[in-house]
Swiss-Prot record:
Keywords: Coiled coil, DNA-binding, Transcription, Transcription regulation
Family: Belongs to the GreA/GreB family.
Coiled-coil stretches: 45-74
GO BP annotation list: DNA-templated transcription elongation; regulation of DNA-templated transcription elongation
NCBIfam families from the UniProt entry: greA (TIGR01462), PRK00226.1-2 (NF001261), PRK00226.1-4 (NF001263), PRK00226.1-5 (NF001264)
Molecular functions per Gene Ontology: DNA binding; RNA polymerase binding
Role played: Necessary for efficient RNA polymerase transcription elongation past template-encoded arresting sites. The arresting sites in DNA have the property of trapping a certain fraction of elongating RNA polymerases that pass through, resulting in locked ternary complexes. Cleavage of the nascent transcript by cleavage factors such as GreA or GreB allows the resumption of elongation from the new 3'terminus. GreA releases sequences of 2 to 3 nucleotides.
Annotated protein name in UniProt: Transcription elongation factor GreA
Source organism of this protein record: Rickettsia prowazekii (strain Madrid E)
InterPro entries membership: GreA/GreB_C_sf (IPR036953), TF_GreA/GreB_CS (IPR018151), Tscrpt_elong_fac_GreA (IPR006359), Tscrpt_elong_fac_GreA/B (IPR028624), Tscrpt_elong_fac_GreA/B_C (IPR001437), Tscrpt_elong_fac_GreA/B_fam (IPR023459), Tscrpt_elong_fac_GreA/B_N (IPR022691), Tscrpt_elong_fac_GreA/B_N_sf (IPR036805)
SUPFAM superfamilies for this protein: FKBP-like, GreA transcript cleavage protein, N-terminal domain
Length: 162
């Protein structure tokens, strides 16, 4: 897959950090674990060896995945963004039309999304409904609980805590 995907500068640094850690710490540690397990004798019935090999396969797979992701990442510094229209990186405050409760979401890349921290993927239904809207606009979003309607109250572009 060669398609670019948006990611915040902080999100990209987090990917790079994980990649570096896997390559320089975990890879070395798993090699040592495999060598130690080999010393325990017959490999055909060596559970430690099999577990270490499985972990090695997982680590190598994750390294490949992270290398692919970092190669395809389109890094967007949201601190340099501004404007009234909602786009990637926006922190958007909404009012629920039914409950009049205020809710805030941050539109991020799919690998940074974490609903517990109010970070929603740009590919999510709520983000898709919000993109291009501005303060005062109303949006409707289909949720598992049915159709929800929101009014956009604020749009900001500010540093994220990941």
């Amino acid at each position: 897959m060669n398609t670019k995907f948006p990611i915040t500068a902080k999100g990209f640094k987090k990917l790079e950090h994980e990649l570096k850690h896997l390559k320089h710490v975990e890879r070395k540690k798993i090699s040592e674990d495999i060598a130690e397990a080999r010393e325990h004798g017959d490999l055909s019935e060596n559970a430690e060896y099999e577990a270490a090999r499985e972990k090695q396969a997982f680590i190598e797979g994750r390294i490949k995945e992270l290398e692919d992701m970092t190669a395809r990442a389109e890094i967007i510094d949201i601190c340099k963004l501004s404007g009234d229209n909602i786009k990637f990186g926006a922190t958007v405050t909404l009012i629920d039309d039914d409950t009049e409760e205020e809710v805030t979401y941050i539109i991020v890349g799919e690998y940074e999304a974490d609903i517990t921290k109010k970070r929603v993927s740009i590919a999510s239904p709520i983000a898709k409904a919000l993109i291009g809207k501005s303060v005062g606009d109303f949006v409707e979003v289909t949720t598992p609980k049915g159709l929800k309607s929101y009014e956009v109250v604020t749009v900001e572009y500010k540093e994220l805590d990941l």
